[in-house]
């Protein structure tokens, strides 16, 4: 499925659309920003769109809402990890983005990295941390600096760049307060990149790469969403051959995970020009600071046109006719 600048989508053909926003995760605030942007875009195109907050409203209310499809603008736990996707499968309501398994896999950084490694895709070396881990040994094995973060959070929440072995325990405890699974990975010194992908299977394609230049190379939660100090370069300014390699790696990583609809791969480009995959976001941000709309604009696709195409592609792991129905 190719995304185009001016899609011919009849808003009435989309039916009643629910925009799931807010939720219960640590990224609730960002989800509200994304969801409200998506809701406004759909309504501006004449779509019968309604916001729905699973953090405040019940499953029974969702089932009774009568949505013909939903746009998942939830981020993090319960919205990006296969949970809401499984519920929507049960309800038979088509939804945007990846299915249950791909969402769950992509949310778990350990599972994602192990799968990528199995397919020979470059990702930083890592180790799982526990309270009784020999932190000095991990630091010696992975090398310093290294990154410690929760295995199942996004938006850099709970992340620490460790520059000395004696910082490891504090970094672990910070991440462990958010997730039982904590990961340490080798720090890749180089350019921070992100690359959106749209479509499914062989039709999946990458949008332009964005190069991120953050203050003091610190692209944290604050710099991602609440300051204007971070520079986003699109076109990326990379050598064209390097850009092609990054885009190809992003698409390959998306296909390996079984993603569909849309997602965003985050990468690092080492000083020698080798790209490394960091993680896959299956429900990317759609705020005023978000990167997917920026990449879309670079190829002439407006925010509204992009949203319309994402929601038009809403589907289920199973075709609706394959869902069990009582006699």
Swiss-Prot record:
<dbReference type="Pfam" id="PF01820">
    <property type="entry name" value="Dala_Dala_lig_N"/>
</dbReference>
<feature type="domain" description="ATP-grasp">
    <location>
        <begin position="113"/>
        <end position="312"/>
    </location>
</feature>
<keyword id="KW-0961">Cell wall biogenesis/degradation</keyword>
<keyword id="KW-0479">Metal-binding</keyword>
<protein>
    <recommendedName>
        <fullName>D-alanine--D-alanine ligase</fullName>
        <ecNumber>6.3.2.4</ecNumber>
    </recommendedName>
</protein>
<dbReference type="InterPro" id="IPR005905">
    <property type="entry name" value="D_ala_D_ala"/>
</dbReference>
<keyword id="KW-0133">Cell shape</keyword>
<dbReference type="InterPro" id="IPR011127">
    <property type="entry name" value="Dala_Dala_lig_N"/>
</dbReference>
<dbReference type="GO" id="GO:0071555">
    <property type="term" value="P:cell wall organization"/>
</dbReference>
<dbReference type="GO" id="GO:0008360">
    <property type="term" value="P:regulation of cell shape"/>
</dbReference>
<comment type="similarity">
    <text>Belongs to the D-alanine--D-alanine ligase family.</text>
</comment>
<feature type="binding site">
    <location>
        <position position="279"/>
    </location>
    <ligand>
        <name>Mg(2+) 2</name>
    </ligand>
</feature>
<dbReference type="InterPro" id="IPR016185">
    <property type="entry name" value="PreATP-grasp_dom_sf"/>
</dbReference>
<dbReference type="Pfam" id="PF07478">
    <property type="entry name" value="Dala_Dala_lig_C"/>
</dbReference>
<keyword id="KW-0963">Cytoplasm</keyword>
<comment type="function">
    <text>Cell wall formation.</text>
</comment>
<feature type="binding site">
    <location>
        <position position="266"/>
    </location>
    <ligand>
        <name>Mg(2+) 1</name>
    </ligand>
</feature>
<comment type="pathway">
    <text>Cell wall biogenesis; peptidoglycan biosynthesis.</text>
</comment>
<feature type="binding site">
    <location>
        <position position="279"/>
    </location>
    <ligand>
        <name>Mg(2+) 1</name>
    </ligand>
</feature>
<feature type="binding site">
    <location>
        <begin position="139"/>
        <end position="194"/>
    </location>
    <ligand>
        <name>ATP</name>
    </ligand>
</feature>
<keyword id="KW-0573">Peptidoglycan synthesis</keyword>
<feature type="binding site">
    <location>
        <position position="281"/>
    </location>
    <ligand>
        <name>Mg(2+) 2</name>
    </ligand>
</feature>
<dbReference type="InterPro" id="IPR000291">
    <property type="entry name" value="D-Ala_lig_Van_CS"/>
</dbReference>
<dbReference type="GO" id="GO:0008716">
    <property type="term" value="F:D-alanine-D-alanine ligase activity"/>
</dbReference>
<keyword id="KW-0464">Manganese</keyword>
<keyword id="KW-0547">Nucleotide-binding</keyword>
<keyword id="KW-0436">Ligase</keyword>
<dbReference type="GO" id="GO:0005524">
    <property type="term" value="F:ATP binding"/>
</dbReference>
<dbReference type="GO" id="GO:0046872">
    <property type="term" value="F:metal ion binding"/>
</dbReference>
<dbReference type="GO" id="GO:0005829">
    <property type="term" value="C:cytosol"/>
</dbReference>
<dbReference type="InterPro" id="IPR011095">
    <property type="entry name" value="Dala_Dala_lig_C"/>
</dbReference>
<dbReference type="GO" id="GO:0009252">
    <property type="term" value="P:peptidoglycan biosynthetic process"/>
</dbReference>
<keyword id="KW-0067">ATP-binding</keyword>
<dbReference type="InterPro" id="IPR013815">
    <property type="entry name" value="ATP_grasp_subdomain_1"/>
</dbReference>
<dbReference type="InterPro" id="IPR011761">
    <property type="entry name" value="ATP-grasp"/>
</dbReference>
<keyword id="KW-0460">Magnesium</keyword>
